[in-house]
Amino acid sequence: MDSLIKLFFCLFIFLCTSLLFGEINGVEGSNQNHHLYPFRPTKLFVFGDSYADTGNIKKAFSSSWKFPYGITFPGKPAGRFSDGRVATDFLAKFVGIKSPIPYFWKDYAGKKRLQYGMNFAYGGTGVFNTQTPLPNMTTQIDIFQNILTTGDIYYPPELTSSVALVSVAGNDYSNFIALNRPASEFPAFIKQVVDQTEVNLRRIHALGVKKIAVPSLQPLGCLPPFTFVTSFQRCNETQNALVNLHNNLLQQVVAKLNNETKQSTFIILDLYNAFLTVFKNKGSNPGSTRFESPLKPCCVGVSREYNCGSVDEKGVKKYIVCDNPKTAFFWDGLHPTEEGWRSVYSVLRESLTASLIKA
């Protein structure tokens, strides 16, 4: 078990590091989806990692600013870890607002653009510090709190109609292995991550945010590096079993918090089962593109030492992109395509309506 965990997360570390730093710009989300229910969110505040980051890392330090990232939307690299829109954009679209501006770009946005909230997520970061030297979630929330304290942009009464997305996609666990900590300590560390997530959720709520959505950990055993050995046909169930402890503890935390508030303030976005549902159905939904090989990534390096977006010293590209990103669930070794995220949020739509809008 010790060697299995180390193999899994060493690969995960390699992928995170190479994709993030060998690899940000707000999106205008659709202003559709007008729900005639009691709670109508008008702002979205985002915290977390590359599944939610829409442009906070400086261009010189992130491959998300390199071609071919962004080829589907907006047609050029724009700081997202995908070919197009990511989780933040689809949640914003669901609640009927424009995608919130990244914190890094706030000084370049007009007041009207800031009214939809702000994105504090940084790719590669975790609940605790990771190998990525960028603000962890505690610091991201500190930044949010400072903005509220100054009162220049947002005022407390405005937060009563706000939603927060809190993305925890596993970077803490890859960092755990990078530090060569013994696998016997791994279960206790998972509890530390979830306990700190609880602290973070409480802080965000105490600052006045009305509803807080936290995704479950996605099935890490279904990431392309770990399905490669089966020609992208099967997920590694042993690795996915390691994810269940995190998700079970997270469910307990959210249930406790909701019991304390006597409301459905905290919501779990079940990414784990949403991903598996898309894989099982191959993305088959009315009006959507079918994923013939949902576990196979669209953009890959030409050999092991290269990744999506890699170029050599002469600027010659060292990656291959599939003919149509809309037919792929995964964009690179870690991140879904825009179409992948669209399919995930299609699966989540019913539960989101019940827990986020109607509740």
UniProtKB/Swiss-Prot annotation:
Superkingdom, natural source: Eukaryota
Entry-linked Pfam families: Lipase_GDSL
Enzyme class: hydrolase
Active-site residue list: 50 (nucleophile), 332, 335
Entry's EC annotation: 3.1.1.-
Subcellular location: Secreted
Coarse class of the protein's main subcellular location: secreted
Signal peptide: 1-22
Annotated glycan sites: 136, 236, 259
GO terms under biological process: lipid catabolic process
Keyword tags: Glycoprotein, Hydrolase, Lipid degradation, Lipid metabolism, Secreted, Signal
A GO CC term assigned to this protein in UniProt: extracellular region
Keyword Magnesium part of the UniProt annotation: no
Alphabetized GO MF terms: hydrolase activity, acting on ester bonds
Protein family per UniProt: Belongs to the 'GDSL' lipolytic enzyme family.
Name by which UniProt lists this protein: GDSL esterase/lipase At5g03610
